[in-house]
């Protein structure tokens, strides 16, 4: 029975599309960012307990999908207010980001328009990399 489950799992892995693999990698990337940054919104600075925080992208995944896993581009935001209601609250995000990572790195993000098409192998590597980073952070 255990062998059958293992074979089933392998079979399911082979059926995953690039979209599935990127979604899984994004989940692990977001978990890592939330653990790395804690519960403090980069845009409004709130640390209120009981509200949901998410991994907000400075340059959105829709506008700059090549930056979707770039850690300079992703920071914790309060979900309901800054990330959703204010569509990322970029007017407050940018100054806080400059303070956090410096103007040069923010300008590099803003000027990075080189498209990148992720492959299935890259998506698997990205997922594994973020799982490992999260594990390392958890043990510190």
Show the residue positions of the predicted features.
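Extended, acidic-biased charged interface segments
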Residues: 86, 90-91, 98-125, 129-132
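Short, flexible, mixed-charge glycine/proline-rich loop motifs
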Residues: 27-37, 67-71
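A boundary/linker detector
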Residues: 1-28, 113-140
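Short Cys/His-rich Zn2+-coordinating modules
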Residues: 20-31, 58-64
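Short microdomains enriched in Cys/His and/or Lys/Arg
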Residues: 2-12, 61-74, 98-113
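Histidine-centered nuclease catalytic patch
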Residues: 42-76
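Short Cys/His-centered divalent metal-binding micro-motifs
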Residues: 46-49, 73-101
